[in-house]
Amino acid sequence: MERIKELRNLMSQSRTREILTKTTVDHMAIIKKYTSGRQEKNPSLRMKWMMAMKYPITADKRITEMIPERNEQGQTLWSKMNDAGSDRVMVSPLAVTWWNRNGPMTSTVHYPKIYKTYFEKVERLKHGTFGPVHFRNQVKIRRRVDINPGHADLSAKEAQDVIMEVVFPNEVGARILTSESQLTITKEKKEELQDCKISPLMVAYMLERELVRKTRFLPVAGGTSSVYIEVLHLTQGTCWEQMYTPGGEVRNDDVDQSLIIAARNIVRRAAVSADPLASLLEMCHSTQIGGTKMVDILRQNPTEEQAVDICKAAMGLRISSSFSFGGFTFKRTSGSSVKREEEVLTGNLQTLKIRVHDGYEEFTMVGKRATAILRKATRRLIQLIVSGRDEQSIAEAIIVAMVFSQEDCMIKAVRGDLNFVNRANQRLNPMHQLLRHFQKDAKVLFQNWGIEHIDSVMGMIGILPDMTPSTEMSMRGVRVSKMGVDEYSSAERVVVSIDRFLRVRDQRGNVLLSPEEVSETQGTEKLTITYSSSMMWEINGPESVLVNTYQWIIRNWETVKIQWSQNPTMLYNKMEFEPFQSLVPKAIRGQYSGFVRTLFQQMRDVLGTFDTTQIIKLLPFAAAPPKQSRMQFSSLTVNVRGSGMRILVRGNSPVFNYNKTTKRLTILGKDAGTLTEDPDEGTAGVESAVLRGFLILGKEDRRYGPALSINELSNLAKGEKANVLIGQGDVVLVMKRKRDSSILTDSQTATKRIRMAIN
């Protein structure tokens, strides 16, 4: 205040005012400030000052031949004076106006293609809707966000190669375009840009925008997908927010969203299979998202989410070094700890073996709706500062931090037994047992935690066990803050290892991720996800399992047929029949399997009773571990459409319907494909199955009489030879074996021998 009074005094004296307004600016320090260095110190002033001059622009000399000296109003467009220090002409801003109105027209066809990202942005904004402005405190946290909607996901190096190939195809330099996306984009762009007159440098810049993901570390309070980030300056300020719905979606956001859904589905499914890691890899390699291989997307896409990171770890890719617990991403910011096993007793006197973090550590915790700073010592929470969108989100963060602290009062707050299991019915590890327990009900935990008096600190407030805010008291060590905690900014990636149960560890052996951390949230993917793996058939429900199982048998009938006769056990154990078992009532699965296997064995033994349709229809039932019983069935039940439906052992039913005339199979009215051979030929294509017990000697030999049908063969005595007519109308010479022991190998060699005999 004193200073201001003093200045007012000075200004009231006329002499002061005169000095300040009239003195020339020729002070050395000032001249130095504004003239040293290439950097313009006051760009807007410079611009205004330049534009006030008559000829502020310089142009190439050739312009004088293309633009008249004066315009229609008689104003001079360019000066005869040369620009000092260059051989360019000085030009008036009016010349630009003249050029825009009267200059040569060029084709504009390439502009929307080159400036695609800009044109699309305009469309999105045109169709977007801006809602009301709300004034409220904004809890922004810095997150790494994608600022460039509509891009492909190439690495900088891959993009550079594509750009060089498109813009400067004849330049020398090693360019290897390897990935599918690189080749597709290059081909597409070369076609689009034929005869393009836009400067190559501009084209290169714009291509880079289209091909590479650009991320920035920005304070965000709302949506983080790129179509929200491009309007960040319009939707949130320090104390206000404006509602906004984007007027269009972009593929990169859709890819990110669909990738997360696919990864979650795959991790959840793999976790319950016999070999989770192998299953996970098989599914990642056979899945496509929006027509692109999932593994290609995983290699290029930087999305960090628990399930996505587990898939990346399985593929041997690097992932972020932060770890996940209770849906929060933890990043240690200081301190260190060693791990040791310790046995603890819950409030229910159940013994738990936990891995204790021994030492002082500080962490940031970042979740979807809440963030926190946690300081802890060995089995003790020292301080937790939480901020979140609402009471519920804040409570979630507090529970996770309390469990993570491993404090005794938390373990003693357990009421009842801990016996939570994962999807595969295996017990969860103790830390996740505790977490699940308190996520269900945290009342006792909060009540037993203890409360303390608090000092008033700017921006901080206390929180009571019932989650109400307070300025006097708070749960011990816990405070709520108005300010969010920034996400971990470094994009550093580390080498990790993964075990067969999908637990991901860093090189020190700390567990970063496990299937328990994968969110159960279900969403609808924006892009089509095609899971080719049989493990994912059940994702669309029982009907899909039924149709897919039979489609698989029909598609692979040639190999299935041979295995059916030669190595049935191997066939029954195929993973493609696994999903089907969930449709068969549990109590009767074993009996069905025993019945079908016996039936199949009779088919193999009694010649000529082979029936393709029946084998296809009953095969999936034979996959369950068989129970021996004398039960016979005329129909088998499957649980689809919410009730049991019957498949007839002999004949068609709504579930399984084979049309002999069209050779088409329909399952529950859905087309399941065409059989390439006619099941009525009884013998067609399965000589290997039927000729067990016979040795194929070669081509037809007339000395052994006319050709018999396969059914007549059973009358031969051991060692007797005969010509036999096989499925395709060919005749071969066979001999009935003297010993039964070698019957199994017959069917394996039969197929080969028949081919040789015929050819």
Swiss-Prot record:
It comes from the Viruses. Coiled coil: none annotated. The keyword Signal does not apply. GO terms for molecular function: RNA binding; RNA-directed RNA polymerase activity. GO terms for biological process: 7-methylguanosine mRNA capping; cap snatching; DNA-templated transcription; symbiont-mediated suppression of host cytoplasmic pattern recognition receptor signaling pathway via inhibition of MAVS activity; symbiont-mediated suppression of host gene expression; symbiont-mediated suppression of host mRNA transcription via inhibition of RNA polymerase II activity; viral RNA genome replication. Disulfide bonds: none annotated. GO terms for cellular component: host cell mitochondrion; host cell nucleus; virion component. InterPro entries: Flu_PB2_2nd, Flu_PB2_6th, Flu_PB2_C, Flu_PB2_CAP-bd, Flu_PB2_middle, Flu_PB2_N, INV_PB2, PB2_helical. The keyword Electron transport does not apply. A motif (Nuclear localization signal) lies at residues 736-739. It is found in: Virion; Host nucleus; Host mitochondrion. Its main location: virion. Influenza RNA polymerase is composed of three subunits: PB1, PB2 and PA. Interacts (via N-terminus) with PB1 (via C-terminus). Interacts with nucleoprotein NP (via N-terminus). Interacts (via N-terminus) with host MAVS (via N-terminus); this interaction inhibits host innate immune response. Plays an essential role in transcription initiation and cap-stealing mechanism, in which cellular capped pre-mRNAs are used to generate primers for viral transcription. Recognizes and binds the 7-methylguanosine-containing cap of the target pre-RNA which is subsequently cleaved after 10-13 nucleotides by the viral protein PA. Plays a role in the initiation of the viral genome replication and modulates the activity of the ribonucleoprotein (RNP) complex. Belongs to the influenza viruses PB2 family. This is Polymerase basic protein 2. The lineage of its organism: Viruses, Riboviria, Orthornavirae, Negarnaviricota, Polyploviricotina.
